[in-house]
Structures are given as C-alpha cells and as structure tokens.
Amino acid sequence: MASPLLPGPPDQRRNLDWCWSKLPSDLMQFVFDRLGFADFQRAKSVCSSWLSVSRNSQPNNQIPWMIRFPKDNNHCLLFNPEEEDKMYKTPNLGNDFAKSSCIASYGSWLLMQPESEYMEEDLDHQCNNLYILDLLTRERINLPILQPEFGLTCPILWTDEKSKDHLVIGMAHEELAISFKKGDSSWKQIPTLSGIEECFSMVFKDHKLYCLSNYKLKVFDFSGDIPVKVFKTSVSKLLNNPLCISMRMRLPGIPMKDQLNHFKDDMVVTLAGHVLIVKCHRPSLSKIWSFEIYKMEGNNNKWEKTVSLGDETILLDLGITVLAKDMQGIKANSIYFSNPTPYFKDQYDENEIFIFDLDSNTVEQPHRSVSSSFPRSRARWFLPCFKRESYFLQ
C-alpha cells in the first residue's frame, strides 16, 4: 500500500489541484467568512476561483490590532499581531487628520478631535469639527461644531455596520453629558444622566453606558428612547483621586515632571458583563507600569482584588475584554494598553504601547519592529472590522 505522505502520479496531482479550484462557491464563502485577516489574504491568493469568491467575503477578525499615529502625518500605520514582521500603511486620510487626535474607536471607526493648538482657529473651518472616520474605507461623517474650548472628554463611540447608525457620547464639562446620533442636527444634552459629575471613564457595551467617577459607578440602559439608570454603587474607597501625585521632597537637578508618581484608574466591562476597576501606577523615576484589578463580588457591593482573567484579555483603550484562547499573537490573562498618561510626558515615557502579563506581573512591548517604528508616536489598540471594499492597505 502506498504511503499517503508520498506524492501521487502527475495525473493524480493535477486532479487534486482541480478539486481545490472547483470547490462549491457557497462552501468557499463559508470558509472565507471565518478566516482572520492574515489567513484570508493567503487563501485568496491560492487560485483565481478562490480570489473570485473572496470578493464576496470579508475576514472575521477577533484579534486586536495596533494603530500608530505618526506625528503631523495624514496616514497611520497598522500592526497585526499575527504578522510580526509586517506593518500596513493607510493612504492619505486627509489634511485635517494630521491636526487631529483619535479620542475613541469602535470597530474600524475612529472619533477624531482637533489638537488643542488648532482649537482656537476659525470654527467654521472644517478641521475644527469633530468627525468619525472609517480607517479602512475612508468613509467620513462630520459632526456638529462643539463649543467647549477643550473639546469632548470621556468620549464614547458606537456604530452599527449594517444600519450605519452611530452614537457619540461625552462630557462637555464636568457636569454636562451630551450626545449625537444619526439623524440629529446638533449635540443634545442628556438630562437623565444628571448625577455623573466628574465622570472620568465611560464604557458603552450591549446598549448600556457605564460611568465611573471618583465616588460612584453608575450604569444606564440605552435600549429604550430615554436612558434609564439601572445600577449605582460607591467606589470612593477604591480609587486614587489625583491623576499624578508629586514626591513629597523634590530631588535637586531632576525636572519636576520626572519626579511624579503616575496614577490612573480605568473601567473595563468583561464579555460576561462584569465590571472591573483597573488601577494603573508608575512610580517616579521609573519606566515600569504596574496594575491591580478589582471585581465586584456578588450583590454585596464589595470589590475584591482579582489576579486572573482566565482566557480573556483586557483591551484597556476600549474598556472591554476579548477571548484570547487559541488566538495567534495574543496572550491571554494580559492587559493591552497605551500610555495611560500621555499628557505628562517625561524622559521615562519612551514608548506609547505596552502589554502587561498578569501571570508574570511584567510589562512587555510588541514586536521590536513595531516599537522602533516612529518612536514616541501616539498609538492605541483597536478591533478592526473588515469590509469587502476595505482592502487598500499597503
């Protein structure tokens, strides 16, 4: 009996090639719709019939990508952890893209806000409007002019790929929550969100808005016409109120900004809908961030420290967790985060993107080629949503 590992006769090999190229298109589309981005690109190059089927399919991406924003550039760079040695470059995203910062994302959509130095220009000029941009198709939706001098804080972006509905929520100042959704002509106050003063972290998941302040965690249900508060609990004993705390005694000859202890608290909603409080800390004169995670246990409103996320991983920029089991290039029980305090740069903030391994309590950086490309450029993690018309990455 011939070994199945040995190549068959030429005619048999030709028949095998013919079988691969003549698979039913509905079966091939079923397969293509379940491939990640890297495998999708490889599969469509197998033969002309596979390429044809791929045009009616799109990758099913569950892997977080990194986006880098080179300073004063109208393009950005994308890194797929599945492909360690490759960076994708987007084409020109517009002149005002270089003058704006990404303040939130949902799928492949970015919420862009003008940099502070451009805020005081003519408000009628388009580059001073907030806008949302699909990074992969370049589809753009301009938002109404926002009057507050410092723009939108605690921003939230949500989109629906099928209906093209979109929702933007944020704080215009410490006591005023505003929103804009598809069909609106202007920003609207959300009076039912009163009582979220000093909110510094928001997450929108499954039509619920989670609001975290120094004192309270509140949850609002957005599934109806009017948001309804469905949960409230105290967090005042858990959080660090100040973002940065200076050393008690200043060291001579060292800039004051290098002597700051950096603190930041964030909120994360897990796949199961549990709320986590993530406490970040970087000591003065140090490059190393450390993290503590707290989870509310039961109905007793008590927060307990947790050291394991199981098969999940935190995407701190998005305030969510994703399933990381069997995901190539993604580590389970880790925190993927960008610099939590970008406005307090010092000589120890050499990098903008990190991975914290909860098993070893160590901070790692992505692949060397990513970390060395455009150092000190802004970066964040996001979950791209690939569409059939979005394959123009270089």
UniProtKB/Swiss-Prot annotation:
This is Putative F-box protein At5g66830. PANTHER family: F-BOX DOMAIN-CONTAINING PROTEIN, OS07G0183000 PROTEIN-RELATED. It comes from Arabidopsis thaliana. The lineage of its organism: Eukaryota, Viridiplantae, Streptophyta, Embryophyta, Tracheophyta. Residues 17-63 form the F-box domain. InterPro entries: F-box-like_dom_sf, F-box_BR-signaling, F-box_dom, KIB1-4_b-propeller. It holds the Pfam family F-box. It comes from the Eukaryota.
